[in-house]
């Protein structure tokens, strides 16, 4: 009897242990199954694995840069020593010749003067009075002038058009004084703006472009400058004006009638199939003849900068050639130059 009870006890203990083992195994299985069922990328307090981690390396496509054609390298197509052609609408470079080599910009400098003037917030009817002390240095150096006289009071608007249409050094000197108090301070302002625009091979020492060893730029930088200038409606209005009459003064009772030098120069060189808009000429003995201009075709604006021409007509002829070469010219982003 006792032996039978002992056997039953052993069997019961064995069954109990087996049941416990089965329960523990089932629990382990369920936990493992739940872990397997967790979707990839679920937030578990760590970094979710990427789907690409499970893809063999050779099957993951490598990122590729889009092919960007180099700009057309100009040579005998033009006579000027420097050139840069840009699509102003998207900043793509179409063609260039020594575009990043330093040269003297002459009166193309006045584009920066115009830009800073238009950004100054000075009202167009703000008056300015000339004196002989500021005019004498310009006369001595043979700078181009509007013709304003000692004691003559004109407006800020008169100075804007006077600096561009006839390329008046008297107008740019006056703008520098109105904006920054004196021309040297204004030149520093010009240089800060140049750096901000990415004109890293440019340095200005005056507002008009009179020759100085430390007054230089590149065709590329001038193209960047003109591109920025065209973003301002007032700048564009001044650059495209064919004629302007200054305020009536006691020195000039009927005002001074100013005509666009660019329009006069380009009259015999207007390109086909594109509408020439305007720009800025330049000349010194060191710079040669220069022209920064822009034209439009089907809503797209193109910029052509040419410099270092030997004759007055040279940059105009080259600009005509380049505008007519625009169709089919490969493009490259100006920021990658």
Range-by-range predicted roles:
Residues 1-11:
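N-terminal Lys/Arg-rich, disordered targeting/topogenic segments
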Residues 10-11, 16, 87, 94, ...:
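Catalytic-site microenvironment of enzymes
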Residues 13, 34, 39-45, 68-82, ...:
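Penicillin-recognizing serine hydrolase domain
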Residues 15-28:
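Hydrophobic membrane-insertion alpha-helices, especially the h-region
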Residues 37-220, 229-230, 297:
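Active-site-adjacent loops and short helices of periplasmic peptidoglycan-processing enzymes
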């Amino acid at each position: 009897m006792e032996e039978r009870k002992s056997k039953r006890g052993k069997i019961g203990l064995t069954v109990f242990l087996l049941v416990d083992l089965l329960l523990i195994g089932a629990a382990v299985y369920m936990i493992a199954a739940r872990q397997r069922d967790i979707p990839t990328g679920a937030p578990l307090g760590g970094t979710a694995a990427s789907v690409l981690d499970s893809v063999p390396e050779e099957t993951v496509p490598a990122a590729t840069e889009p092919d960007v054609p180099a700009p057309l390298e100009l040579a005998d197509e033009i006579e000027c020593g420097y050139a840069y052609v840009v699509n102003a609408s998207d900043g793509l470079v179409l063609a260039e010749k020594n575009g990043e080599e330093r040269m003297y910009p002459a009166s193309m400098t006045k584009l920066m003067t115009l830009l800073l003037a238009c950004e100054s917030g000075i009202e167009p009817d703000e008056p300015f009075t000339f004196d002989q002390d500021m005019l004498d240095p310009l006369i001595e150096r043979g700078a181009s002038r509007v013709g304003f006289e000692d004691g003559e009071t004109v407006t800020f608007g008169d100075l804007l058009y006077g600096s561009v249409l006839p390329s008046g050094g008297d107008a740019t000197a006056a703008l520098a004084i109105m904006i920054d108090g004196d021309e040297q301070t204004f030149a520093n302002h010009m240089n800060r703006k140049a750096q901000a625009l990415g004109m890293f091979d440019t340095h200005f020492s005056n507002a008009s472009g009179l020759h100085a060893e430390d007054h230089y730029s590149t065709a590329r930088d001038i193209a960047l400058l003109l591109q920025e200038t065209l973003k301002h409606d007032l700048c564009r209005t001044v650059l495209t004006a064919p004629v302007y009459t200054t305020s009536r003064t006691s020195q000039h009772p009927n005002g001074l009638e100013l005509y666009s030098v660019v329009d006069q120069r380009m009259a015999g060189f207007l390109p086909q199939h594109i509408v020439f808009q305007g720009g800025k000429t330049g000349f010194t003995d060191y710079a040669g003849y220069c022209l920064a201009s822009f034209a439009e075709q089907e809503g797209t604006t193109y910029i052509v900068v040419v410099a270092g021409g030997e004759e007055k007509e040279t940059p105009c002829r080259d600009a005509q050639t380049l505008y007519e070469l625009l169709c089919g010219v490969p493009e490259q982003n100006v920021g990658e130059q």
